[in-house]
Amino acid sequence: SYTGTLLSTNKQFKNDYPLSLFPSLFLTYKLNDKSDMQVNYSRKINRPNFFQLIPNFDVTDPQNILVGNPDLIPEFTNLAEISYQNQLSKKTSFLATAYYKNTNNLITNYQYRDKNPDPNAKPDTVLIISYANANTSYTFGLELTTKTKLTKWWDFTVNINLFNSALNAGAITGGRDNSQFSMFGKVNNSFTLPKNFSIQLSGDYQAKTILPPNSRGSGG
């Protein structure tokens, strides 16, 4: 649990977090010398950070004022994955992962227009950004990764993540349910240089999604 007092108004706030368990399971089955299957399950927690909890107005940007929410509770995520890995050749490997990720009480931000907290400032109403717990969110998809050693000094990796995500935000005033198919792709080049030097060049593409970037994938 945590407690706090906002000195400007002498307002006190308190929130109790229940005791929770976070089991994990990891199984591997070797199909042959070059390939194997893996099954993974885990439960994780993401607690709101200090700045998300403080009910104090941050007017650094007068047009976009931030305020925390002391009523935020942790979000809990259940993640299940099944993976297939194959060493296609001495130089090339392939990994495919199907996954399902469910989050309860997802911490998200939202905007609303309200009275300016500074009575001497203009305009009288401003856009305020705060945080709230959505009901639930889920993501399921397929992630494909291949790594190839093109030369002794050049490693080439491609990652493609195809997924569908949905968000139930009915707990937030003005919130609504939403779902969308999306994708993420990344290419990475790793070069080994003389005298133990190395360099990496990478690029990625993120299609439009309704969830934060760190919520898109298989949880890795």
Which residues fall in each region the model found?
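Outer membrane beta-barrel strand-and-loop segments of large Gram-negative receptors
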Residues: 69, 73, 95-155, 159, ...
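C-terminal beta-barrel architecture of Gram-negative outer-membrane proteins
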Residues: 167, 180-220
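Structural signature of Gram-negative outer-membrane beta-barrels, strongest in the C-terminal barrel
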Residues: 1-103, 190, 194-202
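Histidine- and/or cysteine-centered catalytic micro-motif in compact active-site loops
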Residues: 99, 159-163, 202-206
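One face of beta-strands
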Residues: 23, 158-160, 183-189
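Outer-membrane beta-barrel translocator domains and adjoining extracellular loop/strand segments
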Residues: 2-11, 50-56, 63-65, 106-115, ...
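Outer-membrane beta-barrel transmembrane domain signature of Gram-negative proteins
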Residues: 1-4, 8-16, 28-30, 129-145, ...
